[in-house]
């Protein structure tokens, strides 16, 4: 089973330090996703400081839209294949900082696919997508751009 969704986008927990640098697209109690200069990173709260998460065996393969692609529909299906050495615990997709309503599944708890589409049509031009996945101890996030 793949757990999809992280909760609300950019949800900040009170009393905790802020992840970064960059734009926080997701912040839970122990895990966060940040984008800075077009590069996404998963972060883990260790003590009272956010640190880059260990990727370990967590892998993400972008299925669509293809990185750098042009002429995509204005409501594109965004999808990623996920895998890890341990059970996947959480995953999510964003476009332009807005979390998608994801669906997904897999044949094992360590491999799966998530996909979703923006709730409203995207404007013509370039957009940034982010995919995120984590296990209990490792996490990874990847960003890519595509054009409508």
Please annotate each region the language model reported:
Residues 35-38, 44-74:
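Short, compositionally biased P/S/T/A/G/V-rich stretches that sit at domain boundaries
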Residues 3-5:
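C-terminal motif of bacterial Sec signal peptides marking the signal peptidase cleavage site
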Residues 30-32, 50, 99-100, 139:
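Short, solvent-exposed loop/turn motifs
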Residues 7-9:
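Bacterial signal peptide processing site
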Residues 26-27, 35-36, 46, 95, ...:
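Structural motif
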Residues 22, 55-56, 67-70, 88, ...:
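Glycine-centered loop/turn motifs
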Residues 14-37:
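Post-signal peptide N-terminal segment of mature Sec-exported envelope proteins
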Residues 79-148:
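Long, low-complexity serine/threonine/glycine- and acidic-rich segments characteristic of extracellular
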């Amino acid at each position: 089973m793949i757990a999809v969704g992280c909760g609300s986008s950019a949800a900040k927990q009170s009393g905790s330090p802020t992840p970064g640098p960059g734009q926080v697209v997701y912040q839970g109690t122990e895990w966060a996703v940040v984008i800075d200069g077009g590069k996404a990173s998963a972060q883990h709260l260790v003590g009272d400081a956010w640190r880059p998460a260990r990727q370990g065996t967590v892998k993400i393969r972008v299925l669509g839209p293809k990185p750098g692609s042009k002429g995509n529909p204005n409501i594109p299906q965004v999808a990623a294949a996920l895998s890890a050495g341990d059970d996947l615990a959480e995953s999510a997709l964003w476009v332009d900082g807005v979390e998608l309503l994801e669906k997904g599944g897999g044949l094992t708890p360590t491999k799966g696919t998530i996909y979703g589409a923006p709730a409203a049509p995207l404007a013509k031009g370039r957009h940034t997508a982010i995919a995120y996945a984590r296990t209990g101890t490792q996490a990874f996030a990847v960003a890519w751009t595509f054009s409508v």
